[in-house]
Amino acid sequence: MNVRESDMIRKIRLLEWVKAELAVGVGEVMRAIAGGVRSSMADAMARVVVSCYVLGRHLGVGYEELDEAVSRRLEGPLGIEEQEIEDRCGDYRALRRYRRLKE
């Protein structure tokens, strides 16, 4: 096996590990919700967010690009399910407001 093949295998393994971390994180969110402890829920959700940023970086999506995609997602038209959530709770509007204040 040459250096290039070895490097490619290493990158694939790393990518698979980060994807597994994301899946584990989603499972932790579900367990934390079932447990009802806010700090555990926040930690588990943070793990998912961080895993998304790390995965994006390894796939060539920079942190700023991901931030911009989130902004576009929040500012753009909502899907049917998202619109239903927005109509009932106003979550997307609240998140947009929060992100604007944070900038």
Give the location of each predicted region.
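Flexible "arm" and connector segments at domain edges
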Residues: 1-44, 49-103
